[in-house]
């Protein structure tokens, strides 16, 4: 299938279907008109009676939900075509803010007392203790420069690579993603800082903090951030 060009649409056939590169400088109405003209002229079929997947590339154009639906409906009006994906190189401010928050390291200096809950979207660096009955939650990793004697939940948004580290690891409950470990019996008071993580089988493991550099070599964002 050869590449064909219209004023606002470039179509390329691939082994995965059709890829539509849409002009990102024209108005949305002009884009719809150009796409409508292209669809009315060209006929697309795989010769087997199956629908052809369409992958849309928007470039530096952002589509609102209503616009995306109009685009999808227009392509779906051709009975042999179905939209598989819509990709854009730009995102909404809200999405950008959410991504920023998830990648942030939030530093807090306090004692989390019984009944209190400390919640952050990204990584948490707590300078202080978590008393029994206190809870800390983070979408990313948890680092406690103090005693962890309450509840710690890291990776609550589905991050199974999150870790929990503490100067004194004596929790009543540890949770990473959805994996729960209640007051691990083998944790004993000592001088070594410890960390908890999920192994390749999804089991929670407690190790000396020195092992963290080998277990999660990508954890370098704290450098220069403390």
Curated annotation (Swiss-Prot):
Question: Which family, according to the similarity comment?
Answer: Belongs to the MinC family.
Tell me the superkingdom of the source: Bacteria
- SUPFAM superfamilies to which the protein is assigned, alphabetical: Cell-division inhibitor MinC, C-terminal domain
Q: What is this protein called?
A: Probable septum site-determining protein MinC
Q: Which UniProt keywords apply?
A: Cell cycle, Cell division, Septation
Q: What do we know about how this protein assembles, alone or with others?
A: Interacts with MinD and FtsZ.
Keyword Cell cycle attached: yes
Q: What does this protein do?
A: Cell division inhibitor that blocks the formation of polar Z ring septums. Rapidly oscillates between the poles of the cell to destabilize FtsZ filaments that have formed before they mature into polar Z rings. Prevents FtsZ polymerization.
- Which GO biological process categories is it annotated with? cell morphogenesis; division septum assembly; regulation of cell septum assembly
First and last residue of the signal peptide: none
